[in-house]
Amino acid sequence: MSIIKEFKEFAVKGNVMDLAIGVIIGGAFSKIVDSVVKDLIMPVIGVLTGGLDFSNKFVLLGQIPASFKGNPESFKDLQAAGVATFGYGSFITVLINFIILAFIIFLMVKFINKLRKPEEAAPAATPEDVLLLREIRDSLKQR
C-alpha cells in the first residue's frame, strides 16, 4: 500500500475526522458559550449569591503602584497596570465555559456516531481444517 493511500485511509477512517469536527464545532460554539455563561448563567448565579460578580473576584498579590490611576477594586484595571493578582473569579467563569462547551461537543459527537453506520466486518477466512474437510467430502462424493 502506498504512503498516500495509507494516509488517506488514516485521515478518513481514523480519529482525525472526529478531532477535526470537534475543533471546528468548538471554535464555532465558543462565542455562543461565552455569551451564555457571561450573559445568562453568571448573572443568575450572581443573583442567587446576593449580587456577587465573579468576573471581578481576585486576590491582590502585589503592591498597587503610587502612579496607579484606575479603580483599585477593578480586576481589569489592576491587570492593565501590571499589578500581581490572583483572578479566581475569571477562572470560575472560564471553567464554566469549558464544561458547557465540552458537554455540547460530547452530545454532538454522540449524535454523529449514532448516524454513522457500523463498518461491515470482512468475512472471516475459512479455517484450513474446514477446507481440508470440504476437499475430503467432495472427493468422497465423486467416488
Swiss-Prot record:
InterPro entries per record: Mechanosensitive_channel_CS (IPR019823), MS_channel (IPR001185), MSC/AndL (IPR037673), MscL_channel (IPR036019)
The keyword Signal appears for this protein: no
Lipid bilayer topology: Multi-pass membrane protein
A cellular-component GO term for this protein: plasma membrane
TM segment ranges: 10-30, 89-109
UniProt keyword terms in alphabetical order: Cell inner membrane, Cell membrane, Ion channel, Ion transport, Membrane, Transmembrane, Transmembrane helix, Transport
Keyword Protein biosynthesis (UniProt): no
One example GO MF annotation: mechanosensitive monoatomic ion channel activity
Family the UniProt entry places it in: Belongs to the MscL family.
Assembly notes: Homopentamer.
The name this protein goes by in its record: Large-conductance mechanosensitive channel
Gene: mscL
